Amino acid sequence: MPQPKQRALSREIILSTALDLVDEEGLSALSLRSLGKRLGVSQAAFYRHFPDKAALLEGIAEQVWRLTFESFLDRVDTGAFDPESTPTPTVSEPTEDAPASPLLIYMRTYAHCLAQTLRSHPGAVMLLLTHPMSTPEQLSLLARVFVTLARHGFTPNADMLGLVNAVSIY
């Protein structure tokens, strides 16, 4: 009788399984051995995709940031902003009664998306606190956010990365 065909091990499968493990058992339970056991492979199989555990942790953080930014981009594109904020941000001249630009609305919406992602993946909270956005993929995701905001009439400035990091850590 032929052996069942094993699915090919890919970076995406490893990261998805690792995030599931972190969600179910916590970050401290993640090891190459425990991940290998879940996937039915040896520890050595991971070194094709990640040079070490630190790179695996960066990849998991990247995946959580991706989920957050994709949720945020979806809300911006559909106009489904945080219910506590104004329904639709508009770019207008500030007045005494309305000094805020859409920045506050976007930041609240981003914070809401991040909180929603972390509620879905509570084991990743500590990981994000110790792995701020820094990889090329993470910065590419952030660039997509800035491009989308610009398409909607908001021009991000050089301080935006610091602001996004501040909201993320808060």
Predicted feature residues:
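Short, charged helix-capping/linker segments at alpha-helix termini
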Residues: 28, 151-157
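Alpha-helical structural segments
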Residues: 12-20, 24-25, 55-75, 105-113, ...
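Basic, helix-initiating cap at the start of DNA-binding domains
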Residues: 1-34, 38-41, 51-55
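Hydrophobic alpha-helical connector segments
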Residues: 70-137, 156-160, 164-167
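Phosphate/oxyanion-binding loops and surfaces in catalytic or ligand/nucleic-acid-binding neighborhoods
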Residues: 63, 67, 152, 170
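Key DNA-contact positions within bacterial/archaeal DNA-binding proteins
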Residues: 44
